[in-house]
Amino acid sequence: QARAMEAAGATIIDSGGESTRPGAPDVNLDEELERVVPVVEALRAQSDIVISIDTSKAPVMREALAVGGDLINDVRALQEPGCREVVAEYGVPVCLMHMQGQPRTMQANPHYEDLFTDIENFFTQQIAACEAAGISRDKILLDPGFGFGKTLQHNYQLLNELERFHRFNMPLLVGMSRKSMIGNLTGQPVDKRLAGSLAVATVAA
């Protein structure tokens, strides 16, 4: 599937072994390693495409980077033990995502005192922690976490004022493709959300 995506024009492949969709169960370390590391190793042997590792576990980060991973994409923003140290050691880029709660419960009742202030404070704290661990500021990307502990209103408020995060002077990763925020607005099932995905991506850009 990764090779087909590259042939279709993909420039980055995101490889993960644990679903982070709302309500998703946890995956143990051994199983995640078995799901991720062989795939990264095989893909690297056949391609120079950028490989992003979607994980929140330091051992998975370490082993996947050792066999050819290029970037860490962490929905928990390197807050789990040992993660910052691994990223600092390998000197790779990292995407820090904001998520309120955990995947299993994050959509139960999302609430913010002030949406942007809360997320900006989170990013400020995590950027400082990364720099203290030896991660260069120019290696950090930020993801406001559309659909991760956010109501429909929160998601579209973020989209409408996304430029507020420009103050960090860091690249923004915006992941909205086929998400429920599109389906809830358009009434379309997952396989019919391409037009909506393109529309919100255009607004974000």
Residue ranges: model-predicted function:
Residues 7, 11, 126-139:
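Phosphate/pyrophosphate-binding loops at sites that engage ATP/ADP/AMP, CoA/4′-phosphopantetheine
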Residues 1, 20-48, 55-59, 65-66, ...:
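Active-site-adjacent loop and "lid" segments of alpha/beta metabolic enzymes
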Residues 145:
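Conserved Motif II region of HX4D acyltransferases
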Residues 1-16:
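Catalytic domains of carbohydrate-active enzymes, especially glycoside hydrolases
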Residues 14, 50-52:
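Short, conserved beta-strand segments within well-ordered enzyme catalytic domains
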